[in-house]
Amino acid sequence: MFVQVAVRNEEPAQICDKIAGIVQRAVREALGNDAARNSVHLTLGSDESKGIQPWLADEIRVAILIISGETFGAAKKRKLFGLIAEMSSLELNIAHDQIVTGIIETPRENWSNGYGERQWLQYLSYQLP
């Protein structure tokens, strides 16, 4: 599981770390310890060079993208999204409509795992009938 967090320019720097912690706790609670243990978090923070305007009350403050090699049922995803929104609201005062979370479920063969082409083919050869 790969988690990417991005925030708007005007957010304090520690927001990214706090959001990453919230996502990890929500993943553990909604999807189980294995999913939380096998996750990598990348926090982008804000990018001053892009010139993004300060956030307004009705704009997105935080965007979270979760890419998973596993498939989760609709109920688990709803629980995950709800937990992230609730924890962010309670702990960071981020309104539910100011945080967007997306999950992409893709098979493990779509992940490089740092392998070059030869290593990848060798890895896949063990899975062929």
Task: Locate predicted features.
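Interaction-mediating elements
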Residues: 1-129
